Amino acid sequence: MKIISCIEELRDHLRGQLRTAFVPTMGNLHDGHLSLMRLARKHGDPVVASIFVNRLQFGPNEDFDKYPRTFQADVEKLEKEGVYILFAPTEKDLYPEPQEFRVRPPDDLGNTLEGEFRPGFFSGVTTVVLKLFSCVQPSVAVFGKKDYQQLMIVRNMSKQFALPTEIIAADTYRAEDGLALSSRNVYLSPAERAEAPALFQSLNSVANEVRSGHLDIFELERKAMADLSQRGWKPDYISIRKQSNLQPPSAGDMAQGEKLVVLAAAKLGVTRLIDNLEI
């Protein structure tokens, strides 16, 4: 595996490749990330991964400097997965001057759910993804469904900017007890780790109610949040949305069988977890 930080060197190595598959990450890799590499290999060759902790997507109350950096361990994992190039730019490589031009997702996608609680987050994400796409110039890029809103926003950005990159969605990789794998899980205490699967269980309960014909969305969301609160969680949201555009479904949408997704974010102790489940 080649490790490259220079954009021009990266382009030289990839020139002439017909179907490069790309997986962007911020490092601190776990089995969920590695499953994205395997899916990428099914859709393209060579596979390029990136590791870059993107300052632009960190808010004023989110500690950029404390984000886990495990570069050498990440390198070993990517080598075992047969990744061809690891693109690992420094901030100076990727942002040689202040990034004055930013991508701004539409408000109805970027300022709801995660965007409401993390202002500017999706602008930071889409700006760095667009820049990474420009560097790698992939035919396909793989994003996990765990970050469902991010997936939708990146997919819409790629479509509206007519980027020659197909966005592939990867199913959420879960532990045996249902907890979605996340770099944040390392912050959970043993007791919190035992409790953490309750978030996915809550999503399943909501989904089962919808499938059984319960159409009062507000009541389902309210009850699910109250149940988590009683267990010691601090939920930011549990919200039922349309898969197509992440807008709240109308009664007509519900009656007509619109494809839905229930999304959640909640704090357990000091650790904020997110998850979702398609219905």
Curated annotation (Swiss-Prot):
Catalytic activity as recorded in UniProt: (R)-pantoate + beta-alanine + ATP = (R)-pantothenate + AMP + diphosphate + H(+)
GO biological-process terms attached to the record: pantothenate biosynthetic process
Residues where ATP binds: 26-33, 144-147, 181-184
Catalytic site positions: H33
Residue numbers binding (R)-pantoate: Q57, Q150
Annotated pathway: Cofactor biosynthesis; (R)-pantothenate biosynthesis; (R)-pantothenate from (R)-pantoate and beta-alanine: step 1/1
UniProt family annotation: Belongs to the pantothenate synthetase family.
Record's function text: Catalyzes the condensation of pantoate with beta-alanine in an ATP-dependent reaction via a pantoyl-adenylate intermediate.
Entry-linked NCBIfam families: panC (TIGR00018)
Name this protein carries in UniProt: Pantothenate synthetase
Gene encoding the protein: panC
